[in-house]
Amino acid sequence: MLVRLTKLSCPAYHWFHALKIKKCLPLCAPRCSSTSAVPQITTHYTVHPREKDKRWEGVNMERFAEEADVVIVGAGPAGLSAAIRLKQLAAEQGKDIRVCLVEKAAQIGAHTLSGACLDPAAFKELFPDWKEKGAPLNTPVTEDRFAILTEKHRIPVPILPGLPMNNHGNYIVRLGHLVSWMGEQAEALGVEVYPGYAAAEVLYHEDGSVKGIATNDVGIQKDGAPKTTFERGLELHAKVTVFAEGCHGHLAKQLYKKFDLRASCDAQTYGIGLKELWIIDEKKWKPGRVDHTVGWPLDRHTYGGSFLYHLNEGEPLVAVGFVVGLDYQNPYLSPFREFQRWKHHPSIQPTLEGGKRIAYGARALNEGGLQSIPKLTFPGGLLIGCSPGFMNVPKIKGTHTAMKSGSLAAESIFKQLTSENLQSKTTGLHVTEYEDNLKQSWVWKELHAVRNIRPSCHGILGVYGGMIYTGIFYWILRGMEPWTLKHKGSDSDQLKPAKDCTPIEYPKPDGQISFDLLSSVALSGTNHEHDQPAHLTLKDDSIPVNRNLSIYDGPEQRFCPAGVYEFVPLEQGDGFRLQINAQNCVHCKTCDIKDPSQNINWVVPEGGGGPAYNGM
């Protein structure tokens, strides 16, 4: 069930429409504070321990435990590649290895969202017989176009051979369908795949090495009390635990701190990707065409761009999407509404006119590149795929590097597991060879070559400076320049105070090309058990109003692409309170990344909840 939004949820709504000006005025005191007590928002046990709650006295908290050789968290391209490669090696060498894979989505692929234009290199390495097996690679790229948009015009830019955005030899895919197919291959090889099980906790041995994971408890009321149906989560123990949670994984966040994995790298920087699927007029359908743009409606200092892919899926289907770098500065910016505005560009709207939108979704993505990759291994576990972040940003691709990292991890794990001279200083195996092998692979070479392109957009010319840098230095030196540019810090630190920014007045959606937020989220299939604690937890319930609303005019109500956060009037007294509509959450992780106070902590809801994407 989706939660309907109200115009009162945005204090600035009345402000904009009463004044009808584009100048930021001093913020009004009533929305900054109230004499009444701060309403309790967070009831989750990660913030309010159950040991201190009398309602939990006498509840059986024992957990059942299972043992495996390898446990993998996340059934995306990386996690499935690791599982499949492990079982391939085991079959080749006659070894018996138990591999368990847990996935929080109700079905494999239901939480997967990407463009996606696939570089098939790693996929073909993993499945040399992919054609015979019927892999859903149905749309080879036949036409590749890139352009700069102004408000009214499209300026074509040639894609020269060797530039990272060249898509010759690639395939347009529905990544959710490809992941679902990979899940079938994994199960056929003997991988134990458990959809609907959300990994909620990292378990440790007494020596500090990773022991495995525990899935989350189910049967807890919204107020934090146990239901009569309460069930403790399951523990999965393994010699090696592989974390393939995707971008900004909530367990990876804990591991970064536990093992200081980010001590020698830049802060990760992110983007938010929004996507829709459309069925269009068959006369406008060009199967295999790839379109990318930069520029309007974003200004030059806001990194981002768009894609429009024509799929050959038996019907005139196109994937349209928009990416906004989460290092943007204006708190009034709404990535969702920028996306809706972009579709009205004279070069985009004609393709969609007369068509029907059939799906919507959003997901954060890593943009930090080589400089932001953390240490990948630690006693008992390792990180693969988009969890550490192997996306090639100028290439606009990360699936191929994620898959290769999974395969390399599997090969390193298998070698250590089956070694006759296995020695380990810790109970959980430390597979250090994985990071060494990755740095010697084409993944590292590819990311090293493009390492300076994304941070080159931070200069006075913004995105256009990055394009100039690419055209000169990358074209000539191919990434061999003897310097490495730095990112400018975490995305949460980049917002300016609202008083220093110009409000953005977005056009009203027309219901044909552009749409409102609620009708969009409805197309994601998102659903959560209503009577459970909100999985969007706050470290301090007072901060959203006292700091975020006061200083930044409540940016969470705009950066969330699903209408999860609303500022609504207090029932008693003056001022506002934050309302969290957790049922709407599409698990994109943007709030955890962009919150300027770093007060929001995304944790897993009950397994099986969230979006139900069909081939996104």
From Swiss-Prot:
Catalytic activity: a ubiquinone + reduced [electron-transfer flavoprotein] = a ubiquinol + oxidized [electron-transfer flavoprotein] + H(+)
Record carries keyword Magnesium: no
Phosphoserine: residues carrying this PTM: S550
Transit peptide extent on chain: 1-32
Molecular function GO terms recorded: 4 iron, 4 sulfur cluster binding; electron transfer activity; electron-transferring-flavoprotein dehydrogenase activity; metal ion binding; oxidoreductase activity; ubiquinone binding
Gene3D superfamilies attached to this UniProt entry: 3.30.70.20, 3.30.9.90, FAD/NAD(P)-binding domain (3.50.50.60)
Gene Ontology biological process terms in this record: fatty acid beta-oxidation using acyl-CoA dehydrogenase; response to oxidative stress
A Pfam entry, by short name: Fer4_ETF_QO
Cofactor binding description: Binds 1 [4Fe-4S] cluster.
Enzyme Commission identifier(s): 1.5.5.1
PTM info: Acetylation of Lys-95 and Lys-222 is observed in liver mitochondria from fasted mice but not from fed mice.
Cofactor annotation: [4Fe-4S] cluster; FAD
Sequence ranges marked intramembrane in UniProt: 108-129, 427-446
Residues the record lists as binding a ubiquinone: G304, G305
Keywords carried by this UniProt record: 4Fe-4S, Acetylation, Electron transport, FAD, Flavoprotein, Iron, Iron-sulfur, Membrane, Metal-binding, Mitochondrion, Mitochondrion inner membrane, Oxidoreductase, Phosphoprotein, Transit peptide, Transport, Ubiquinone
PTM sites of type N6-acetyllysine: K95, K131, K222, K356, K415
Summary of the function given for this chain in its UniProt record: Accepts electrons from ETF and reduces ubiquinone.
Homology family: Belongs to the ETF-QO/FixC family.
Protein name: Electron transfer flavoprotein-ubiquinone oxidoreductase, mitochondrial
Native species: Mus musculus
